[in-house]
Amino acid sequence: MKDISQIFKSDIKIEDVKQENGIFCCMNDHFVSGDNQKYMKMYDWMSFFYDFGEKWIGKLKYGNGIDRLRTELMSRLEWKNAISVLYVSIGTGADLRYLPQGIDLKTIDLVGADISMGMLKRCKKQWQKKTNLTLVQCPAEELPFADNTFDIVFHNGGINFFNDKALAMSEMLRVAKPGSKLLIADETADFVETQYKKSVFSKSYFEGKTVDLNAIEQCIPASVAEKKTELFWNNKFYGITFRKSN
């Protein structure tokens, strides 16, 4: 990125922002509570084996299902070379392997945001030499970026259990450029019930939890255009695309 300071809000002085391992830390303790805090801790410890689990255990259990899912989700966005992209809840950056053919990641000004420092560190280790990547630790409910900054904003995995889903949606829209297309995706209630509540690694984190897709859809402001909800991977995942009004 040519000038990293340009992506941040005008009241944020880049030289004053704390960094850890080259990752900008913009955490507001107000949002590090409840489910946000619980799942931040979960992903911090899962970060050590997350990619291994998806590559090998996921492959054994689901075949190429996860690969097809990520490819389909990424195809719903309007990718071009030399654009600016915000990936909210970037995790280890797994979706970056599934961009449409012809897209050169090194031409893209890519910003990844996540509440989990563990996942961000894994992401940096895997992608810093392959991309033009800036990583920021922050809650989705308070993105530290300037209004109308990114050509693409997308989120895959997490919003089901954000503390304030509507605020996170509002923030993603705020930082997207007018006319740009956004994607929000996460697991359906069926997948949470049959996978996360059964897995020895995650069941304690999802006890008593459920997913209300209708409620999540209602968190998207009425001002958006071209809103569309799709189900993927045999109804295990949903994806909602919409366009920010000009």
Regions found by a protein language model. Give the residues of each.
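N-terminal accessory segments
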Residues: 1-27
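Short beta->alpha hinge that forms the Motif I/post-I loop of the SAM-binding pocket
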Residues: 114-115, 164, 187
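Class I SAM-dependent methyltransferase SAM/SAH-binding core
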Residues: 84-142
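C-terminal alpha-helical "lid/dimerization" subdomain adjacent to the S-adenosyl-L-methionine
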Residues: 181-241
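A short glycine-rich, Lys/Arg-flanked "PGG" loop and its adjoining helix->strand segment in the class I
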Residues: 166-178
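Conserved class I S-adenosyl-L-methionine
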Residues: 18-80, 94-98, 119-122, 126, ...
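A short acidic, Gly/Pro-enriched loop at the edge of an enzyme's catalytic core
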Residues: 141-152
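A short SAM/SAH-binding and catalytic strip from SAM-dependent methyltransferases
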Residues: 151-164
